[in-house]
């Protein structure tokens, strides 16, 4: 593909896009914009931030996006829950203002102003492909193809305007493939485009692609200093740890089978 792109990843997207738009105004040409979102992606897992994990599992393509654009070092997420976080990104408003404050709410109010709607008004063709998780159907998009609810890692269901079908394959590969197909053949190439590529990964419960099962078989990941914390003299912290173990499915994440 030979696309002029302004790339963004999760919480790194808008500064490069704005810079590209400034250049576009100077040239009289509007840039294409791709917003790439991963799910529950820890900062420490991106090697551009310099965490020791990055030496074991480097992320060179993510790093390149930051090196060619901007990296945020002092920022926050206004809502860390899946659906509400997406609603905040779409609207630029906190959850109590956009009305979507928790998952499994009544549904996102798609009648309000959003980024894709503004770009449509500016002559952009818009699309969202991948995880949506806002219950109501997407608005402000010329094309949308979204996962059913959280989506599945293997053979996921995709929803389009009139159909829900199972697609054979691994979800990250499929979302990437469908985004490429839309950019190559599914859009009006006389218009600039705005594409939201919303990946399910790396949301728990983790299921890697089969080809990656042994990718880190011999790697040794550094443990944090408090990994074996006994919580001596800190009863409240100990109880909170027990709640995390019970409520956050650590056993399932570690592929532990109950006897």
State the predicted function of each range:
Residues 4, 8-9, 18-259:
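Formylglycine-dependent sulfatase
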């Amino acid at each position: 593909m030979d696309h002029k792109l302004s790339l963004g990843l999760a919480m790194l997207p808008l500064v490069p896009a704005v810079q590209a738009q400034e250049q576009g105004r100077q040239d009289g040409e509007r840039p294409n914009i791709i917003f790439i979102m991963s799910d529950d992606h820890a900062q420490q897992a991106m090697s551009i931030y310099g965490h020791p994990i990055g030496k074991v599992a480097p992320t060179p393509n993510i790093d390149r996006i930051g090196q060619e654009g901007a990296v945020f070092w002092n920022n926050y997420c206004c809502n860390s829950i899946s659906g509400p976080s997406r609603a905040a990104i779409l609207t630029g408003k906190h959850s109590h203002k956009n009305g979507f404050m928790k998952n499994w709410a009544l549904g996102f109010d798609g009648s309000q102003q959003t980024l894709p709607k503004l770009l449509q008004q500016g002559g952009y063709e818009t699309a969202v492909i991948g995880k949506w998780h806002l219950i109501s159907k997407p608005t402000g998009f010329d094309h949308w193809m979204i996962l059913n609810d959280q989506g599945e890692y293997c053979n996921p269901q995709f929803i389009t305007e009139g159909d829900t079908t199972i697609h054979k394959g691994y979800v990250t590969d499929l979302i990437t493939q469908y985004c490429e197909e839309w950019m190559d053949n599914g859009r009006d190439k006389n218009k600039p485009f705005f594409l939201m590529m919303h990946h399910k990964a790396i949301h728990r419960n983790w299921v890697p692609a089969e080809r990656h099962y042994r990718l880190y078989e011999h790697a040794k990941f550094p443990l944090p200093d408090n990994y074996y914390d006994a919580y001596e003299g800190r009863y409240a912290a100990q109880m909170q740890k027990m709640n995390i173990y019970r409520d956050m499915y650590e056993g399932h994440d570690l592929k532990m089978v109950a006897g």
